[in-house]
Amino acid sequence: MSLVAIGINHKTATVDLREKVAFAPDKIHEAMKSLASRTKTGEAVIVSTCNRTELYCNTGDEADVISWLESYHQLSHDDVLPCLYKYQGQQVVQHLMRVSSGLDSLILGEPQILGQVKQSFVKAKEAGTVAVTMDRLFQNTFSVAKKVRTETEIGAAAVSVAFAAVSMAKHIFSALSATKVLLIGAGETIELVARHLKDNGVDSMIVANRTISRAEAMCEEFGATAITLEQIPDFLPKADIVISSTASPLPILGKGMVEKALKQRRHQPMLLVDIAVPRDIEAEVADLDDAFLYTVDDLQSIIEQNMASRREAAEKAELIVEEESHHFMEWIRSLESVDSIREYRSQSMAIRDELVERAINKLAQGGDSEQLILELANKLTNKLIHAPTQALTQASRRGDLNSLGQLRAALGLDKD
């Protein structure tokens, strides 16, 4: 058996095709069982996210795995094949380790993919489609992903606007958990900001939005308070951090409103991060002594620097992945030798048992014990050295010095 992986991701296929080959969470267990039944080992793991669908199997038949995917989703071979990537053996190990470490992600180094791969592995174990090889592969992969995070800076620098906004707040406030945050807007970016804030221990969040129902839906998830845009002047003085991202054509926060809020705060500093285009916060707010205003352009320059840092870290991460994939394949090859060793030992023991049984029978018939022991030793020696002797003779006749050297080493003939 050999490891096989096939997949489609954001680099190779359109959203339309990625949607067609994705696996619904409520059907993933049955899908894994179905795929595993097509392999001789019964081992299969399916990783299915919005950006990728990948099938990992312990089987030698790559074509059969592709055929199963096409059949399961009722897609034509011509539609699927041009978008597929295929790996075997060590390539599978290396690819899975790269994916789990965030090296193959749309956003280089993003950490979410590791959790998604872990979840896929758990589901495969629940489905009963994981045995020794797949278990070792995925457990090793998780250790490698952790090593990449620990030994490189692949995930240290912010590379999304939302993450960069929260990272900036962390640099200014020593403990985000003690801050009060006002979020303006309730779109995808602000939702991501809220998630990052929550992960950093922020409990006091207010979400202001033109549509209160949208803000309330978001607040329910994060334990925040929803208000309308008209209520901002009442809540602004309480905010240590303001992060805004709306689609408003005109500024929502003017210099006068912020100045009034700062007076009510007795000039305690306020961080304002405007990640909207066009701007939500008037540029003149930056002129106020206790207001620290940053725009999307400020964040973008930080992101560009951080991306360069991540690319540098990724080079080191690639070396870790390559080395660890080699180590895993050494283990795989050692497994392949187990059957040969077991067969060789079994064969030797069968020879021993046969000759011992003959000697015992002759001894029972009154044979000379000393003579029988010598005869047993000679026959056993001749039987056991027959195959190695034949191999040495054939290698010598062929002039195959490499094989001859390997045989001598295996038989312990080159020891000092």
From Swiss-Prot:
Superkingdom of this entry's organism? Bacteria
Site positions for Important for activity: 95
> What are the binding positions for substrate in this chain?
49-52, 105, 110-112, 116
Name the keywords, alphabetized. Answer: NADP, Oxidoreductase, Porphyrin biosynthesis
Instruction: Give the comment on domains.
Output: Possesses an unusual extended V-shaped dimeric structure with each monomer consisting of three distinct domains arranged along a curved 'spinal' alpha-helix. The N-terminal catalytic domain specifically recognizes the glutamate moiety of the substrate. The second domain is the NADPH-binding domain, and the third C-terminal domain is responsible for dimerization.
* Role this protein plays: Catalyzes the NADPH-dependent reduction of glutamyl-tRNA(Glu) to glutamate 1-semialdehyde (GSA).
Indicate yes or no for the key word Oxidoreductase: yes
The cross-references to InterPro entries, in alphabetical order and at most eight, read: 4pyrrol_synth_GluRdtase, 4pyrrol_synth_GluRdtase_dimer, 4pyrrol_synth_GluRdtase_N, GluRdtase_CS, GluRdtase_dimer_dom_sf, GluRdtase_N_sf, NAD(P)-bd_dom_sf, Shikm_DH/Glu-tRNA_Rdtase
Which species? Shewanella loihica (strain ATCC BAA-1088 / PV-4)
Further information in the entry reads: During catalysis, the active site Cys acts as a nucleophile attacking the alpha-carbonyl group of tRNA-bound glutamate with the formation of a thioester intermediate between enzyme and glutamate, and the concomitant release of tRNA(Glu). The thioester intermediate is finally reduced by direct hydride transfer from NADPH, to form the product GSA.
Lineage, opening ranks: Bacteria, Pseudomonadati, Pseudomonadota, Gammaproteobacteria, Alteromonadales
Protein's UniProt name: Glutamyl-tRNA reductase
Q: In which pathway does it act?
A: Porphyrin-containing compound metabolism; protoporphyrin-IX biosynthesis; 5-aminolevulinate from L-glutamyl-tRNA(Glu): step 1/2
The molecular function terms in GO held by this entry are: glutamyl-tRNA reductase activity; NADP binding
Catalysed conversion reaction: (S)-4-amino-5-oxopentanoate + tRNA(Glu) + NADP(+) = L-glutamyl-tRNA(Glu) + NADPH + H(+)
> Binding of NADP(+): at which residues?
185-190
Positions in coiled-coil regions: none
Biological process, per Gene Ontology:
protoporphyrinogen IX biosynthetic process from glutamate
Q: Which gene encodes it?
A: hemA
The active site annotation covers 50 (nucleophile)
